[in-house]
Amino acid sequence: LQKSKYKVCGYVTDVEGNMDYFNKYVKISKILEWTCEKKNRLKFKKNDSIFIYGGDTQDRGDSDIRFVNILLKFKEDYPERVIFIIGNRDANKLRIPSEISEKYSNYQNFLKKYDNYPYWEDKSVRITLRKYLKDNNYDLNIKNRLKYIVERTMGNKDGFEKRRVELSIILKKNINNISDNDVISSFLNSVLPKPKNITQSNDNYMLKYLMQGQLVHIFGEHIFVHGAINEKNIGKIPKNKNTIEDIHIWAKEINNWFHKELKEYMKNPKDGGITKKRKAHNIINYAVPGYNKDITIVYADNLKNGNGVHINKNVIEHLNKYGIKNIITGHKPHGDCPLVIRDKNLTAISADTSYSNINYLKNIKDDKYYNDKRGKAVSEVLLYSNGDIRVHGILADNSKYGYIIKKNKKSPSSSDYIGLQLNNNYWVKNFKNNKYLISFGKGFDIDEKWVNLQELKKLLKKL
């Protein structure tokens, strides 16, 4: 392994345009802080650290543009020390130009093309453009097509109007003076090589993020992807039947593949509609579920029906062979603190906590956070060049926590149990006040309970 000149990496993921959450993260962060009270520019606290953003910058909050611009400025100030991982909510924005630019002469023929779209969704839950327009009594026009794309197929509820609000804030204009065309231009400009009407919307901030992003990054013994590394995708490059053995070469080659495809897209971003002819098709296809028997690292996960699963033994051996001992990901939420999955030779951490507000999930409306899926919870994962991992943050009940997983521990510690699966299939997720948080996921529901060491040891005994 090439020795890094940096000691520690700070990691957060899946902010999804939620500046309230990112502010909470900066407040607890050990490695970065705001430069001033305006909270629009970041700096490192020390010279020995780097920062990795784990992907998914967009869609769920009200600050998509502002959040990415903060990240871009941070990378401009520290180009070597700030790394962007590309998530599905980042890559899928390349769909917008070709889908809203497509012309049609026959209404019914145009809708018919969309009757099997989105192709990555099961027919039982798929909402087609035809159904969306009918259910909402909408006309077929660019505005409603964009609303369908953003709000229905990208999961950005009220995304069109949220963008209008954000533009009014950025441009310092009355919201009534932000037109539908301004909003359309905003989404379109975000991924165009040559954005237009910038003064009334924004520039190509998302394209800039993608141009500077990576699908894979390696820091010491830690490897970062948005989704997961498994037996289906390790060493795989899209459109290439060969498997790359060396993990470091694979990381380089899959990043090269992405940027080659992105350059092709930039030559002609608007043509092709929803067909395979559009230049971004390969990237779009790679960042959706079910791609080519799930060889994607962007949309994979370490869950089965919402609960953690052990990392494949062959994957562990393969990663270990090339000096990798930890996989750091986001993508799929799991409670109000990161999910840790440990084998004696590898630790996998999934740090997406975007569904951490239990009251929201249960729709309890007497909690002031009921309309916020995140609530009070926030976390930071710190990865050290010596292989150690530190996780700290605030839980949904507003209590603080923190633990360290040491690579070369000389004596037992309370964190030794974190990341183990119990005989009732619960995972040990946290430690606080001499008790352990154990958790079982089912879909987006999480059953959690605190147990003492004696209770934990009983659950660790083989049946």
How would you label these PLM feature ranges?
Residues 1-463:
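Feature recognizes metal-dependent phosphohydrolase scaffolds
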